[in-house]
């Protein structure tokens, strides 16, 4: 791949999830699934440009497996493969032991918490 990200940008290749089946054995097609939010960093920029003109090195490095928000980055196609170009700020976490997840799964779900009060409670 010939892509060199600038400043605090990183290039991420999504990690594919295993095939999903419903309890009744129906295979869920890729078009019906959400895109994975786990990826491998394949390129990093030189660092974040600070107000004083200095570059602050990035925390992530090539080869890191990262977790990111489903709306993070911009998709680009390079040599027939789809990559995400995003700011380091869009990375939620670095997965320290990805080998323990192989064959398993990572699920990321955002939940909205609602607070309701019953009548008579403060």
Swiss-Prot record:
Signal peptide: none annotated. Keywords: Chaperone, Cytoplasm. One of its GO terms (cellular component) is cytoplasm. One of its GO terms (molecular function) is protein-folding chaperone binding. It holds the Pfam family Cpn10. The keyword Chaperone applies. The keyword Iron-sulfur does not apply. GO terms for biological process: chaperone cofactor-dependent protein refolding. It is found in: Cytoplasm. InterPro entries: Chaperonin_GroES, Chaperonin_GroES_sf, GroES-like_sf. Belongs to the GroES chaperonin family. Heptamer of 7 subunits arranged in a ring. Interacts with the chaperonin GroEL. HAMAP family: CH10. Together with the chaperonin GroEL, plays an essential role in assisting protein folding. The GroEL-GroES system forms a nano-cage that allows encapsulation of the non-native substrate proteins and provides a physical environment optimized to promote and accelerate protein folding. GroES binds to the apical surface of the GroEL ring, thereby capping the opening of the GroEL channel. This is Co-chaperonin GroES. It comes from Aquifex aeolicus (strain VF5). The gene is groES.
